[in-house]
């Protein structure tokens, strides 16, 4: 799954910098940078009404009465679920980040790992969104993990190579075909000193 990701305020990747700066200029409340958590307002790329990719500020997680926000959707079955079907067909988005975090069990502790595509400064996670009232909400699609991180978690976000990002935002392109191009070769870095005790 993906329950945390990271996008620095001052990123060496020029494209990420432009996205954050654009949103912070055009919105009264800045988007979250640093470690982004569920329900935070984050930077998301989606099509405008003119079908042009544009940065938007969206809340992370589909809000459902009496339940925790839905922050992830399984890419393999999302198109068949009423909650996600419209998003898969018409409301696709990209969530830019430097890396995402996942916790690995180690005895009675959990070790926090930063995970990112090998040799990449920025990554783009595939997502879908909806608008409730006037609030846009997004969820991140997940898939089976690459072989190098299967020991950490049994799911990972769908990370698209840059050449597939344009197709993902194009509703005329088959969603599952685009998602099949997802990046699976990732690296992980344990973050020393950042650990959480397991709840037993």
Please tell me what each predicted stretch does:
Residues 1-200:
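Short linear sequence motif anchored by a di-proline
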